[in-house]
Structure formats: C-alpha cells, structure tokens
UniProtKB/Swiss-Prot annotation:
Enzyme Commission designation: 2.7.7.48
InterPro entries reported in the protein's UniProt record: DNA/RNA_pol_sf (IPR043502), RNA-dir_pol_C (IPR001205)
SS bond list: none
UniProt keyword terms in alphabetical order: Nucleotide-binding, Nucleotidyltransferase, RNA-directed RNA polymerase, Transferase, Viral RNA replication
Function, in words: RNA-dependent RNA polymerase which replicates the viral genome.
UniProt superkingdom: Viruses
Catalyzed reactions per annotation: RNA(n) + a ribonucleoside 5'-triphosphate = RNA(n+1) + diphosphate
Name recorded for this polypeptide: RNA-directed RNA polymerase
One Gene Ontology molecular-function label: RNA-directed RNA polymerase activity
GO BP annotations listed: DNA-templated transcription
Amino acid sequence: MDYLITAFNRITHWFLTPTNLEYIGSYSLPPGLLRVNDVAVANHKATLDRSFDKYLYEHEINLITKEYRRSPIDEDSILEDFFSGDLPYFEIPFDEHVERGLECMAAAFRPPRPCRPAHILDVKHGYPYKWNVNAEPPFSTDEYFLSQRKTFGEFIRMHEYEHIDKEDFFRRHPNIESHDFLRTVVPPKFGFLKSMIFSWTRRWHHIIKSGFQDSTDLEQTGYFFNRFIFPMLLHTKTAIVKKNDPNKMRTIWGASKPWIIAETMFYWEYLAWIKHNPGATPMLWGYETFTGGWFRLNHELFCGLIQRSFLTLDWSRFDKRAYFPLLRRILYTVKTFLTFEEGYVPTHAAPTHPQWSQENIDRLERLWLWTLENLFEAPIILPDGRMYRRHFAGIPSGLFITQLLDSWYNYTMLATILSALHFDPLHCIIKVQGDDSILRLTTLIPVDQHTNFMDHIVRLADTYFNSIVNVKKSEVRNSLNGCEVLSYRNHNGLPHRDEITMLAQFYHTKARDPTPEITMAQAIGFAYASCANHNRVLWVLEDVYNYYRDLGYRPNRAGLTLTFGDSPDLTMPEMPLDHFPTKSEIRRYHTETHYQNEAQNARTWPRTLFINAPGE
C-alpha cells in the first residue's frame, strides 16, 4: 500500500509542480534485480578473515569488517537513488562567465583538425566494444528478437565468435561439446547478437538519415512511430559506505545499441585522438595511476619557486544535476570538433570518397541530431517496470560518450566559476575526467582564506548550475603534495591510498558470486592498487592468493575487471596472473615520464583498418 501511495503521489505531484521526472507508463519486461550468492560471499569473507588475523591489528580488522559495509541491491535503495534526480527546474544564467566557460572548453578540447565519422561497417569490424554486456532494448526485451537468437551450436558453427574473448568464453562454458550446451539458446548479450544488432541498426540508421522518408516498409511499426528511440534499462552497481551512512550506488542506464553505435561512428576518431595524445586536452586519460600518472601529473602541475594554490572539487550527484540547456550548448560546440564534409575516416579498403555530396552531409547531420534526440528523450525503465522521462536534467551513464560528456560539462562549470572569480581559465591548468578534477590556479591563496575561497566556489556553483559541492571531500591546498585525484593522493609524484579502506573494498566484495578463482585475481588487482606502499597489505593479499593456489585453484581474469572496472577508456599495463606480483612489478611504471601501451593503442585505433593516425 505504501508503494501505491508513493507512486500515486509522485504522479499527481508532477501535474501540480512539474519536476524533472515524469511517469509515462509501464514496460512489459522490466530489468530484474541481480541476485547475490550469500554462501560464496561468506566463504570469501572467511578466507580474508583468516589472513587478516595473521597480519592486521584487532582494531583494523574491526574497522574493515564491522565499520564498513556494501550497500545492498534492493528495490527501495535503487528507487531512492533514481528519484534523487527528480529536481525542480533551474534556469542557467548564460551571462559572460558561462559564455567564457564554453569558449574555454572549446579551446581546451578542440582537436588539431575536425574529426571524421567512421562507417558503420568499420565500427562493426573494428571497434573494441565490451561484448559480454546486455544487448539492451529492443534486442534483450522484445519477443521477435529473442526468438531469433541462435543456439550455441549455430553460433560456433557460423564462426560468429571471432570478436569475443575466447578465454572468457571457454571459462564460462567449459563443456562446449556437450549436446545440451550446443542446443542451448545464447543469452541476449551484445556479443552473441552482434550480427542481428548491426543488421537492424544499419537499416534503422538508413531510415533516420533519410529524414524518415525512406521507411523500408517499417512505417507501421511502433519502432518507426517512436523514431527508433528505445527505453533504457536501469542497471546498478553498489559502493562501500560506513555502516551508519546511507546507501550509495552507481546506476548505469543501458542505452540502446543503435544509439551507442551511432555515437561510436561520430566520436571514435576524436576519442582515439585524445587517448593517443595524453595531455593534449584536459582529459586525464593517459594518467592512470599504475602507468605513472601521478608522476607525470606532478611534473605538469609543479610550480617550482613560484607558489600557487591547487583545487580539487567533489560534486554531489553530478550526473543528475546536469541541465539540458547547457548540455545542448556544449554538444553544439563539440560539433565543431567534427566534420561531415570529407566523408568517412579513410581506410585501406576505402581511402577516398569521390562521390561525397551535400546529401551525404545532410544524412549524417540527421543521424547526429537523432543522437541528441535520444539523449534528451529516451525514457528509463525502473526495476518495478515503471517508465520515466527526464524533462530538463540528467546525463545517462551508459552512453558511448558519457565520460566525455561529463568531462565537457565539468570543465565548463569549472571555467565559468574561475571566470566569475576573476581568473583566466586558460591560464590555469584544469584536468578533468568525468566529475573528477584537479586545478592549478594562477595565484597563491593564503591558508587563512581557503575556507572563504571554498565558500565562494560553493555559492557560484549553486548560482550558475544548481550544483552541489561536497565540501567534506573538496580541498584547497598550497602544495601539490597531498592533492587527490582519481582516488590517489600525490606524494612527490608517487601515488598513495588508504590501505584500510582498500582492504574493506576487497572484504565487502562487489562480486555477486566470488569464487576462489575470482578472489585470487582480485588479490592481484588490489596488490597493484596498493602501489606496494604497505607491506602488511601485500602480506594479506599474497596469503589469500597462496591459500587458494595451494588448494589447486587458478585466478580468473574477471576478478581484475571487478577491481578496476572494464571501461574501454581505461589504459592498464599487463598484469600476469600466474604468480603474485613482486614490489618491483607493481611499481614498474610508477616513474614513467611517457607511458605508451602499443597494444592498447592498436585496439583503440587499429592501423590495420585506418590509413592515418587519429586527428591526421
């Protein structure tokens, strides 16, 4: 009954005082809640308890095991987090400072030449997507597409597995010659439905590019009526919190694959240019901790004899408080980073496009505008099946360009605030990645003025953007030592992190089914995450690894994904799993002045496909 009353009140409230989220109906197949194997989690904790008893003090064990917890994945917590984005309308004042912020963002992120789109077939065969993810609506929800799925036998026989991770596939399915397995229908994952998804997406993109004039006999379908804008499923990842703190989670909005693929076409070259040229933009891609990121960042931000202040800001509910009017201005500015007039990115198979015409330009323009239509119109499906549409705020977290979009928005806010404080943003050094940031100002702010300075920033963030600065996690410092970005603090160019919090993350694992193989790989991952700064932490982690090794288990690389995430934007050094790493292996790249992972670069921008480097 409470649920019905809450839902009814939310619907009727919207008509009285329109807020950001509007209920628009229910979906036939809502996303289910992911279940946790409580027995496996208990076994995981028991193994770590055994190692903790050997090497940690009692108060440390109590802090890790009793004072921290992982937020549960339950419907009430998910709905509470989602509806925290039901904000009142806010009008951003586009005065000279916001305009200056947009100008500085454009100058800071502009590539040396406009980037060209990639052809959809080049995206299909060349982009390194995460394949073991949900196919998303309509492919994962609508009966027609679900009924078209192949069996594993057909999938293997037709050689449709070339793109997937073979090691992961055989680990998940060890009995591939079993008749039962070969007759089993593949799950609705992107990798298993790749051919179907790209085939339909190409057809739908053709209709969109024609301005919905060439319907290819689909004009009577609901997909055509909805302009191929499909709803997003709400996926959830939990976080570690103190035992008495409110639940915290990260929601991932499953954007449709036709939308993801279109964004890949438009932004692949631009994204690859940023990754291949760390430091060319404010993006912190290429400054990953384990590759010597803080060492290089320390060099770039160091002031020498001229003292200056440094600023790190933490935003509360950053994505939810991003307003559409500024997002539109940002995206129309970013469009000047692209060109549709030169054809697609030259490949060895198609080095030129001599027949390129204004009609081709217009077709790409329509598809690009359709990606914006998705951004501002696509509804979201909650676990209980209710569908909501955002009216004026919120950046979906599952887009191809989510981290870029967050970074552009974050930089624009920071540059606006600096301008309002009478700084020239382009004379400051601003580094961003999503909602994370570190700034070097052009002057030294006396220590006794730090609180006053932060108060000004808080006020301006609220005045200009209705954004909330988390003052407890934001800092003004007069030394680069001790500054924190990307979860690590700087100690003269070397990264440091609180070891107890890190062990709490390992203990309260995010793995839903932490097998011994997963836990072994996580132990290696956390060893690298520790940066070899804490001997006792390494002893604990190695003890866990050796315990399972002596029982005959071998690490499963999926455990590294749980530790570091699986974003294609993440550059990581190779981490062997056949042994526990030594200190020298962990620290191998910590003092690299110029880190390049050629294998990663080749995946990001395969020169076997493209003629030129990105941005050339």
